[in-house]
Swiss-Prot record:
It catalyses: an alkane-alpha,omega-diamine + 2-oxoglutarate = an omega-aminoaldehyde + L-glutamate; putrescine + 2-oxoglutarate = 1-pyrroline + L-glutamate + H2O; cadaverine + 2-oxoglutarate = 5-aminopentanal + L-glutamate. It comes from Klebsiella pneumoniae subsp. pneumoniae (strain ATCC 700721 / MGH 78578). The lineage of its organism: Bacteria, Pseudomonadati, Pseudomonadota, Gammaproteobacteria, Enterobacterales. It comes from the Bacteria. This is Putrescine aminotransferase. Disulfide bonds: none annotated. The keyword Transferase applies. Keywords: Aminotransferase, Pyridoxal phosphate, Transferase. Belongs to the class-III pyridoxal-phosphate-dependent aminotransferase family. Putrescine aminotransferase subfamily.
Length: 459
């Protein structure tokens, strides 16, 4: 039965939410009521499937904790006052921590002046952020298109490559097996997981996939496409596959792909949505081997965990296809003042606190610790891998991975699996994680593995 719109109900709901936003603390009854309310609204108005997903990583089989506020730079507090060390990092958005004061202050100061741009007058922060990224990014990258997410940055990269290469008769794209580039139609065409792709077939034509890390397969595909007249417009890669399970390519793979792109006249698009902004121990993962892309995709941590923002940064040669008509590809909220303020502050924090170098140091410490645990528990752990503060623990099967996440939840450490590889648990904390907190995480992992071994033996 269709229901009639109710202004009174909408008004009451919004007023209740505003009252909640004003609160700093909740008493016991308020907490219980909010937990029930949030679960009900997720079930009835968001997506009931999310409840089952959250349920799989909670202690005792109850529904997931309801988030309330940041506890500090590296922790979250739920409505029950429980504090969790964040080793998930919002899937890579909290590189400078939760509510970093420099980022929050920049956004608040801009909010006091003008939160969104007029669309007609020139907005200064967009210009300043574009200039900053031109200075920060490698090679000849010079111009930036701003959007709101990683998926949008990939969409822009695909369109930019198409616009540049279409006059040259090049329309084919090569991505890799295990890749994740987003779930909008264009980005999904480059993504390589059937679960996400199958319901939306047919996707964009002209996308091919080759095994990640296999330079011979890449060379063969480029060559075969040339032979059949399906010349390649661009190769799109993650320097390290994040959702694929934190998969690192062999040393020399990215430089070799760059060389092949030059040989065949294809553009190189690097998707650093997850690996960028210091995550792997360099500002950008491509810098580990001095690889310079034609187009670079950024998002997630670019907004400092305070505002959503994505960026597609390209060389002048490629970006110039938009010069004559800058409205060929636009988005209303892309490059808005609040998002640009957050991004500028984030870059400032990353550089002044040398967080990429900290990520390298702390990442080595955590990786060494996890690898020692893997040696102690070879019956549970297949492999530990990663670079900087992007790490993964691969378990012997999916069930062990789920159980490890639940055990870590009991130890008040948040972790989660990857979208393309269920038995792999990703460790992706803020780069601001302290050495003491690193030790706490390793202790929690040891306890979790010990508990898992007991449960496996009992089963």
């Amino acid at each position: 039965m269709n229901r009639l719109p109710s202004s009174a109900s909408a008004l009451a709901c919004s007023a209740h939410a505003l009252n909640l936003i004003e609160k700093r603390t909740l008493d016991h009854e308020e907490m219980k009521a909010l937990n029930q309310e949030v679960r009900e609204y997720f079930k009835e108005h968001v997506n009931p499937g999310f409840l089952e997903y959250r349920k799989s990583v909670t202690a005792g089989g109850d529904y997931g904790a309801v988030e309330w506020q940041a506890g500090g730079l590296n922790t979250l507090v739920d409505t029950q006052g429980q504090e969790f060390i964040d080793c998930l990092g919002g899937f890579g958005i909290f590189n400078v921590g939760h509510r970093n004061p420099v980022v929050v202050s920049a956004v608040e100061n801009q909010l006091a002046k003008q939160p969104l741009h007029s669309q007609e007058l020139l907005d200064p922060l967009r210009a300043m952020l574009a200039k900053t990224l031109a200075a920060l990014t490698p090679g000849k990258l010079k111009y930036s298109f701003f959007c709101n997410s990683g998926t949008e940055s990939v969409e822009a990269a695909i369109k930019l490559a198409k616009a540049y290469q279409s006059p040259r008769g090049k329309f084919t794209f090569i991505a890799t097996s295990g890749a994740f580039h987003g779930k909008s139609l264009g980005a999904l065409s480059a993504t390589a997981k059937s679960t996400f792709r199958k319901p939306f077939m047919p996707l964009l034509p002209g996308f091919r996939h080759v095994p990640f890390g296999d330079i011979n397969a890449m060379r063969t595909m480029l060559s075969e496409c040339k032979k059949t007249g399906d010349d390649v417009a661009a190769v799109i890669l993650e320097p390290i596959q994040g959702e694929g399970g934190v998969i690192l390519p062999p040393t020399g793979y990215l430089p070799a792909v760059r060389k092949l792109c030059d040989e065949f006249g294809a553009l190189l698009i690097l998707d650093e949505v997850q690996t960028g902004m210091g995550r792997t121990g360099k500002m950008f993962a491509c810098e580990h081997e001095n690889v310079q892309p034609d187009i670079l995709c950024l998002a997630k941590a670019l907004g400092g965990g305070v505002m959503p923002i994505g960026a597609t940064v390209a060389t002048e040669e490629v970006f110039s296809v938009l010069f004559d008509n800058p409205f060929l590809h636009t988005t209303t909220f892309g490059g808005n003042p609040l998002a640009c303020a957050a991004a500028l502050a984030t870059i400032n924090v990353l550089l002044t606190q040398n967080l990429p170098a900290q990520a390298a140091q702390k990442g080595d410490m955590l990786l060494d610790g996890f690898r020692l645990l893997a040696q102690e528990y070879p019956d549970l752990v297949n492999e530990v891998r990663g670079k900087g503060m992007l790490m993964a623990i691969e378990f012997v099967d999916n069930e062990i991975g789920y159980d490890f996440a639940s055990e870590m939840f009991r130890q008040r450490v948040l972790v989660a699996g990857t979208l393309n590889n269920a038995k792999t648990i990703r460790i992706e904390p803020p780069l601001t994680l302290t050495l003491e907190q690193c030790e706490q995480v390793l202790k929690a992992a040891r306890k979790a593995l010990a508990a898992l071994r007991v449960s496996v033996e009992e089963a």
